[in-house]
Swiss-Prot record:
Gene3D superfamilies, per the entry: 2.30.30.30, Nucleic acid-binding proteins (2.40.50.140), Ribosomal protein L2, domain 3 (4.10.950.10)
Biological classification of the source: Eukaryota, Fungi, Dikarya, Ascomycota, Taphrinomycotina
UniProt record, GO biological process: cytoplasmic translation
InterPro entries: NA-bd_OB-fold (IPR012340), Rib_uL2_dom2 (IPR014722), Ribosomal_uL2 (IPR002171), Ribosomal_uL2_C (IPR022669), Ribosomal_uL2_CS (IPR022671), Ribosomal_uL2_dom3 (IPR014726), Ribosomal_uL2_RNA-bd_dom (IPR022666), Translation_prot_SH3-like_sf (IPR008991)
Name of this protein: Large ribosomal subunit protein uL2C
Segment forming the signal sequence: none
MF GO annotations: RNA binding; rRNA binding; structural constituent of ribosome
Cellular component GO terms, alphabetical: cytosol; cytosolic large ribosomal subunit; nucleus
Organism annotation: Schizosaccharomyces pombe (strain 972 / ATCC 24843)
Length: 253
């Protein structure tokens, strides 16, 4: 008879996002007539930190083209952006760092960030610190553009989808080790409830299938079938492969 493991006994409430002191959604401008047919100019007011986010944010002020007021947008800051910088958004904007253009207007090989999946969704791809998207090629007949994502995967997006020229600021953030549990505590408390995480082999057998024994070891294969029962479904679930990659790919000089 199976045991009810600790994760099942623990249960848990509905997750509530840690949004205290967050600065709001980081998005491009709403797509309008000015961006579709020309460009609009904004100025970077300040660069700020957003709790729980690795990349800094930039507050960019635009004059509203239809009403007598100033609209302040929150952009994901690109590397090299500074306060007082002019940012141009639109089809006819120049190809300089920080400007927002449709991907179809940029040449192949351009490095961009915060790219839209669909025109007008205000940014979805390449948004974390140090990340960027590379334009691979354009298909004029279908109006599509092929881009390379930070993961290395290729994706096809509409040529009318917008992106910010340059890479996201804050690169190299993970190069500095945390070193202390206190730093990890403060890092994850503003993100989500995912730290600390106890290993299964450190538990008792009543708490986890990997627990127990006179020394810490699993004692059986860690791969489990997809159809495993709850409480048994721990470890490498329905793994296609396990272990280290053996051998090296042949490289032509």
């Amino acid at each position: 008879m199976g045991r009810v493991i600790r994760a099942q006994r623990k249960s848990g409430g509905i997750f509530q996002a840690h949004t205290r002191l967050r600065k709001g959604a980081a998005q491009l401008r709403t797509l309008d007539f000015a961006e579709r047919h020309g460009y609009i100019r904004g100025v970077v007011q300040k660069i700020i930190h957003d709790p729980g986010r690795g990349a800094p944010l930039a507050k960019v002020a635009f004059r509203n083209p239809y009403h007598y007021r100033t609209d302040v947008e929150t952009f994901v800051a690109t590397e090299g952006m500074y306060t007082g910088q002019f940012v141009y958004c639109g089809k006819n904007a120049a190809l300089t760092v920080g400007n927002v253009l449709p991907v179809g207007e940029m040449p192949e090989g351009t490095i961009i960030s915060n790219v839209e999946e669909k025109a007008g969704d205000r940014g979805a791809l390449g948004r974390s610190s140090g990340n960027y998207v590379i334009i691979v090629g354009h298909d004029v007949d279908t109006g599509k553009t092929r881009v390379k994502l930070p993961s290395g995967a290729k994706k096809v997006v509409p040529s009318s989808a917008r992106g910010v020229v340059g890479i996201v600021a804050g690169g190299g953030r993970i190069d500095k080790p945390l070193l202390k549990a206190g730093r990890a505590f403060h890092k994850y408390r503003v993100k989500r409830n995912c730290w600390p995480r106890t290993r299964g082999v450190a538990m008792n057998p009543v708490d986890h299938p990997h627990g127990g024994g006179n020394h810490q070891h699993v004692g059986h294969s860690t791969t489990v079938p997809r159809q495993s029962a709850p409480g048994q479904k721990v470890g490498l679930i329905a793994a296609r492969r396990t272990g280290l990659l053996r051998g090296a790919a042949a490289v032509e000089n």
